[in-house]
Amino acid sequence: MQVLTILHQSLYQHCPEIHQKRLNTLMVACKALINADCLTLTHLGRHIDGTSTHTKHSIKRMDRLLGNPHLHHERMAVYQWHAKWLLTAHTMPTILVDWSDMREGRELIALRASIAIKGRSITLYERTFPLVLQGTQTAHNQFLNELRKVLPDNITPLIVTDAGFRNPWFRKVEQLGWYWLGRVRGLSVYRPHPFGRQFSLKALYPQARRRAKHVGRVALSVKKPLLCEMVLFRAPSKGRKGLRSTTTDCHHTAQWTYELTAKEPWALVTNLTMEAMSPQKLVNIYQKRM
């Protein structure tokens, strides 16, 4: 298959850290994935082509590959090559970061950085954490430090996140010399900078319109205020109706929470200046998350 040949040659040329035998087995796993169309250990083992080996031994072969500590160490080189290939023409790429559930068991959760290209999300870097570390500063700092090693040195990315990422995340991103764009919700408090009394975000919502509005430079939070620019925007209603089947617990309270969240205006915050990027452009960038 031509695509596997190109992939093998690229990894052989740009990732010399990977041992030849491990690289060959990795290509066997890639071909098995294409044949199986399902990424599980047993499916990979059962769909290895061109071998007379018993299925049990093929599954064990995939198990050894996935658990190989050398391959886990060498995967950083693959991420670096992939990021360099994707971002070579971008000096300030927009990188979307979010948590993603691991469906089996819910013991692990993935934190993923991706780039949106022509309506499609392509992963730049991801790693898993125990579920108890979801949203913690420990996980965020570790992820950002590893992401810095993956990205080329000559770029300054714009990191886009949802309302689950707060001031400690923004400070860490800024410490790395990057730009950030996020959303604040709920009981977040701000005050106009440099002088002004404190306001709740909900007091701003009536001012939101379909045209993005620059609120101004604000100090976010009270105890450890973070200076940033704030943009307010209300997206037009999409006319969606809650028509879930009664067999899928359509009366669960979470449904009403999701509906209220979808109707809330966007309060976006960033360390970019309005001269560098207009309010409407910031809204357009944030919409790439959807």
Predicted stretch roles:
Residues 42:
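Residues within the helices of the helix-turn-helix
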Residues 59-118:
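Active-site-proximal, Lys/Arg-enriched surface segment
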Residues 1-38, 46, 77-78, 90-93, ...:
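Single, function-defining residue in the core of a domain
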Residues 48-61:
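Short, basic interhelical loop/turn and adjoining N-cap
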Residues 34, 50, 68:
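Nucleic-acid substrate recognition interfaces
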